[in-house]
Design a protein with these regions (language model features):
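His/Glu-based metal-binding/catalytic segments typifying zinc-dependent metallopeptidases
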Residues: 41-43, 50-52, 163, 167, ...
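M16 family metallopeptidases and their MPP-like homologs
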Residues: 46-56, 82-130, 136-148, 175-200, ...
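Extended, domain-scale alpha-helical bundle/helix-rich regions
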Residues: 430-470
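Generic recognition of flexible, low-complexity loop/linker segments
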Residues: 95, 211-215, 272-275, 332-336, ...
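Non-catalytic terminal extensions that flank enzyme cores
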Residues: 1-48
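Active-site recognition of the HExxH zinc-binding catalytic motif
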Residues: 61-73, 562, 566-570
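Non-catalytic, conformational "gating/processing" segments within enzyme and secreted inhibitor domains
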Residues: 159, 211-243, 691-692, 713-746
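Hydrophobic, small-residue-rich alpha-helical packing segments that form membrane-like cores
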Residues: 149-222, 226-244, 248-274, 279-281, ...
């Protein structure tokens, strides 16, 4: 391709090398509309397409968020009710989603398959430019908001997918703080508004304004298209021009007015806590400030380094001073860089409003004359550069988003994907006062801080519900008649329950089974014995990064000790000082030597076993080949020489408990599933005791009784070290490292013998359990055991998720998310941010009948579900994930013959197979286990449920 030449209406303006991606950047402009299109040419066979619109909110109704959901519900060319879901069901997509940001809406897709890639791009282009929203108001009512009413005598309810999603978001402490920070930092431009929508304001959005907003902003002149990978660029340009851009004239483009940095001001908001929680020390105090402009990439990276060194660990100087003063339980920071004017936040967790001035005094004292250690700066830069260079997936999407960080605001699109020179510049600044100046720009500029104080309230949820109810009554009082709203609701339900016709289904692009790779992806792993140790050897990473995983069996450890070991492994190892390193020095050394280091627990269940599992403590590490010896030595230091000092352990414990509290509100479905699955398999029990509600209850009890339990806890930890880290329990996994490098490590382990590897944990027994949390929505988790495993259950679960549950739980019931999962241990279902958990649980009883009805559909429908299922089984993975997958297969005794046989079983599946599967599902659901995590109103409606609690 040649610069200044025209390609299907696009002029090629510039071609530049992108060495960091081993590729080139091609920049095009569409002549007729001035639309911008860039192609990041790489050898990546996973091809990515995204189209982005600059969408600038003008109120809190969440109109752009609702549009993001709505345009994917049918279009001029693709006439089914939900083409987005059809693609999830039937394509070979490796990424398929849409995202609303404070100033843009992004529609990305990717696929390894050329035909599929063009199909995905076509559906998305038609969705954004020719959506069915203009002819079908039901889409707005379903995805946005509506009055739900069936009888003139009843009080209506608000319902809608986005409305319920945002009720869940508004239950999150951090979301509330960030929304208020946006309001206070940017009072003069569009960033002041909640782009996702405030639940109080969403019902203010009219259908007419919704359509008007789409017409105004969804135009090629306001679009940025990015392609990434080994794309047939001329075919793509021809398609985009002929099918879409050529039909438009030049339209409006939009700019964001820069916000003047204003004098300091303080705002107070309320955050919800559970009725049984004490409000003492449950406030949050956050300081925020605008930091320059989007094009100051060096400053953004430098500020991240400054924050990391000052508050990144409990022994970082500023965080340590605040913790030791007792002014807060935790200190965190955030950099919001995907904005025209980035900003930074320093957040103090679990504090009191009255501590505000003392906190400022501590910040002044620590930062006034602080000078950064050159070695610590070097380590931080090295660590950040390692993460930048290590390929993450989905790489094409990440490249696109990084490029948009500058390009969206008419900056240079190459800046966000070519950062090597910036890391070199930062190294040169180590010997100057640059980092101290960056510190002062934020920490010593109180006169421009926005301070947000979030105070706990036990009544805000009740007041919020009462306000919504009062509004509904007021709205109803102003109606001349309820009949139009009842008819609107009935029409919506009729549309939701009407299956797509054959004519509608035929409009969707389709693949055939012949397009699917019949062979499974292999993860070559050689298993040998070295110095009496089981060693798994993987091929070297082409990038030159080396990886090692260490596994120590936890067999023989009583079930009641699992939570203790999980806390020890996940929160203490690597987060405490050691005999030879202070925590700050250890953190610096980790960044320098092992930029990727994680410690925790995991388990591997032998093939076709549910009664037992193999539990392990695991250490995962990635580094450069030149640092291998230092990395191994550092891991030894962490495992055997960590100093378990009472005060520092307590700080980590409190922070862990706060994290779990927030996770229960934000991701309650994960905890519901963990609990439910603990009733069906030994693996489920292990995960519940190491990550679930039981784990949370253990940590809370340990904090509540810390003084009296400390000596016993410390003794148990020391005993764990002497028992767990033994040669007999050790398995080594390596990629790109000689096994001999670990000889000293192996001989440094103790010689305590282990008894077996498979553990049979007793299953939980209660069929129905519930946990009450604060928040506006609820979550469910259901688990059931299968007598025999058939790989076809994977297809069944895929179908049920994207057809039956999507329609019944998300579309009709208004839950933000739902799904069914199946593996060798059984199957489970869940709902997420669910306004009516009882309804969602009842839906499960209809799965078997739905499957029997599915048999009446054409065989091609079954083929499409097989295609979609296989796509989900082969996600994009970076090399580190490939190594971990290889370990999992070996340690679960699943060889390539088993995997290939299962693939062939899937490809041979016929729709009649659903009849036998339906019978098994129906029988299994008779003995299901249900868990609900929800607010007070939802839990109070449950009958026959055992009440759970994190607290004693």
């Amino acid at each position: 391709m040649n610069i200044n030449e025209n390609y299907s209406g696009f002029t090629l303006n510039r071609i530049r090398e992108v060495p960091d991606l081993k590729g080139k950047l091609y920049e095009f402009t569409h002549h007729k509309t001035n639309a911008k299109l860039n192609w990041i040419q790489t050898t990546d066979t996973n091809k990515t397409f995204s189209i982005t619109f600059k969408t600038l909110p003008f109120d809190d109704t969440g109109v752009f968020h609702i549009l993001e959901h709505s345009v994917l519900n049918g279009s001029k060319k693709y006439r089914t009710r939900e083409p987005f879901v059809d693609l999830l069901k039937h394509s070979m997509q490796t990424f398929l989603n849409a995202m609303t940001y404070p100033d843009k809406t992004v529609y990305p897709v990717s696929s390894r398959n050329d035909k599929d890639f063009m199909n995905l791009m076509s559906v998305y282009m038609d969705a954004v430019f020719n959506p069915a929203i203009y002819e079908n108001k039901n889409i707005f009512l379903q995805e946005g908001w509506r009055y739900e009413i069936h009888d003139e005598k009843e009080v209506p309810k608000f319902n809608g997918v986005v409305l319920n999603e945002m009720k869940g978001v508004f239950s999150d402490v951090y979301s509330n703080i960030f929304d208020e920070m946006f309001r206070q930092l940017y009072p003069s431009n569009s960033y002041q508004y909640v782009s996702g929508g405030d639940p109080k304001a969403i019902p203010d959005l009219t259908y007419e304004k919704f359509l008007e907003t789409h017409k105004k902003f969804y135009h090629p002149s306001n679009a940025r298209v990015i392609l990434d990978g080994n794309v047939d660029i001329e075919a793509v340009l021809k398609f985009i021009d002929e099918e879409y851009f050529s039909h438009y004239e030049k339209g409006e483009s939009f700019t964001i007015e820069n916000q003047e940095v204003l004098p300091a001001r303080t705002s107070t908001i309320e955050i919800e806590i559970a009725p049984e929680d004490s409000p003492e020390n449950r406030s949050y105090i956050s300081f925020g400030k605008i930091l320059g402009h989007f094009y100051e990439l060096k400053k953004k990276i430098a500020m991240s380094i400054v924050h990391s060194i000052l508050v990144g660990t409990n022994e970082a100087p500023l965080k340590k001073a605040i913790l030791e003063s007792g002014l807060a339980q935790d200190v965190d920071y955030s950099l919001e860089t995907e904005l025209q004017q980035p900003f930074s936040i320093l957040m103090l967790v679990n504090t009191e409003e009255e501590h505000l001035e003392k906190i400022k005094e501590v910040i002044r004292f620590v930062t006034k004359d602080y000078h950064f250690d050159p070695k610590e700066l070097e380590a931080s830069i090295n660590g950040m550069e390692f993460h930048y260079r290590e390929k993450s997936e989905p790489a094409g999407l990440l490249n696109s988003l990084h490029s948009l960080e500058t390009w969206l605001y008419d900056g240079d699109p190459i800046d966000g994907i070519q950062l090597s020179s910036i890391f070199n510049e930062l190294r040169e600044e180590i010997s100057t006062s640059y980092f101290e100046e960056m510190m002062k720009e934020f920490y010593d500029d109180e006169e421009h801080w926005v301070t947000v104080i979030a105070k706990p309230s036990k009544t805000i949820a009740k007041r919020r519900d009462e306000a919504e109810q009062a509004r509904l009554l007021a709205d109803q009082a102003n109606w001349e008649s309820a009949r139009p709203y009842i008819e609107e609701q009935l029409a919506l339900e009729a549309w939701q329950t009407t299956p797509d016709t054959k004519e509608q289904l035929d409009t969707m692009p389709k693949l055939s089974l012949s397009d699917v790779q019949s062979k499974v992806i292999l993860f070559p792993t050689e298993e040998i014995s070295y110095r009496g140790t089981r060693v798994l050897i993987h091929p070297s990473d082409p990038s030159g990064i080396v990886h090692f995983n260490l596994y120590f069996s936890l067999a023989g450890l009583p079930k009641d000790r699992l939570s203790e070991v999980a806390f020890f492994a996940r929160q203490l190892l690597g987060n405490l000082a050691t005999e030879n390193y202070s925590l700050s020095a250890l953190t610096s050394e980790i960044k320098n030597v092992i930029p990727v280091l994680s410690t925790g627990v995991t388990c591997f269940t032998p093939y076709n076993r549910t009664d037992g599992t193999q539990p392990f403590l695991e250490i995962t590490a990635s580094t450069l080949e030149k640092n291998v010896d230092q990395a191994i030595a550092l891991v030894q230091e962490i495992l055997f020489k960590t100093k378990f000092e009472k005060e520092f352990v307590l700080n980590l414990l409190k922070q862990s408990n706060e994290s779990i509290r927030q996770s229960l509100v934000n991701s309650g479905h994960q905890y519901a599933l963990l609990r439910a699955k603990a009733h069906t398999s030994a693996e489920g029990v292990f995960n519940e005791y190491t990550r679930g509600i039981t784990y949370g209850a253990y940590l809370q009890s340990l904090e509540d009784h810390f003084e009296e339990d400390w000596e016993g806890f410390l003794e148990a930890i020391q005993n764990n070290i002497s028992v767990i880290f033994s040669q007999d329990r050790f398995i080594l996994s390596i990629a790109g490292i000689e096994k001999e490098k670990f000889e000293d490590f192996i001989f440094g382990l103790n010689t305590v013998k282990a008894n077996g590897t498979v553990v049979h944990y007793p299953l939980l027994q209660d069929e129905k359990e519930a946990l009450q949390i604060s928040g506006g929505v609820s979550y469910t988790g259901v688990a059931a055991k299968m007598e025999t495993y058939d790989p076809c259950f994977q297809v069944l679960a895929h179908l049920v998720t994207y057809d039956f549950l999507w329609t019944e739980v998300r579309v009709k019931n208004g839950a933000y998310g739902t799904g069914m999962r199946s593996n060798r241990l059984g199957f489970n279902t869940f709902s997420y941010r669910d306004p009516n958990p009882i309804v969602s649980l009842e839906v499960n009883q209809k799965i078997a009948d739905y499957l029997r009805d599915f048999v009446k559909k054409p065989e091609t429908e079954n083929d499409l579900n097989i295609i979609g299922t296989i796509a989900t089984m082969e996600p994009l993975m970076n090399y580190r994930s490939q190594v971990k997958t290889g370990d999992t297969l070996v340690l679960s005794s699943i060889d390539d013959h088993i995997r290939q046989a299962e693939r062939e079983r899937l490809l041979a599946m016929k729709k009649e197979d659903y009849l036998a599967l339906a019978d098994q599902v129906e029988e299994a659901l008779k003995h299901r286990f249900q868990v609900v995590i929800g607010n007070e109103e939802a839990v109070s409606k449950l009958d026959g449920y055992k009440k759970l609690s994190i607290k004693e």
